[in-house]
Amino acid sequence: MSGAVLLDLDGTLIDSNYQHALAWYRAFRTHGIVVPIWQIHRLIGMGGDQLVTAATDEEIERRRGDSLREAAAEEFAALRDECSPLEGASELVTELERRDLTVVLASSSNEDDLEFFLDLLGVKDAVDGWTTQADVEKSKPHPDVILAALQKAGTSEAVMIGDSRWDIEAAAKANLPTLAVITGGWSEQELRDFGAAAVYDSLTSLREGLDETPLRPRSL
């Protein structure tokens, strides 16, 4: 039984993965680089410091990485108002707080986006802290975000909740299990194959099944 939970933001609590994919697609196109959008979607969950090389190569990262990240941020800013909380997101966070769990958002978003999404969710008072890109040197699948979130939670043990391969891999490198949801566009089988401890078809299903996870009350 864990006393802390780390929550991914994009694709897990906020329906934003496809907006991020479109933003990156457009950013690449403005630099004359065509990357199929389905391939970009598979990389969402990585931060921009990892995504450029993964989508293209080290030469493009070296020559254009910073300008591509800047362009992607501008494109996403234009799409951000189209993002919305995923069904059951606020209720899940509220339930985690009700269980007296330490709740930390494990994100490498910039501070502005994170504050915007916290306001959308309406759960700022229900979380104990969060990470942003300023807290990490390398984004997922490196464990920096997870380790920074653990530090804010004041523990070395927690459960990760996420939607992607990159969440699972980052958590595993910090020896944490992941409860995964398919809300980010990865299939149940894929998430299981990458090592998720359990997979849920919605945040509501996850909330209703919490007593079957390490987040159950200690009395159970």
Model-flagged regions — what are they?
Residues 2-99:
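N-terminal helical cap/lid subdomain that shapes the substrate entry/recognition surface
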Residues 13, 85, 103, 138, ...:
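Conserved SAM-binding loop
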Residues 19, 43, 47, 71, ...:
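Short beta->alpha linker loops
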Residues 23, 51, 113-116, 170, ...:
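Phosphate- and divalent-cation-binding pockets in alpha/beta enzyme and binding domains
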Residues 25, 29-31, 51-58, 82, ...:
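Substrate-recognition/cap helix-loop segment adjacent to the acidic, metal-dependent catalytic center
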Residues 34, 61, 124-128, 197-200:
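Conserved H-loop
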Residues 42, 95, 117, 148, ...:
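Well-formed, non-transmembrane alpha-helical positions, independent of function
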Residues 159-200:
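Acidic, Mg2+-coordinating phosphoryl-transfer loop and its flanking beta/alpha structural elements
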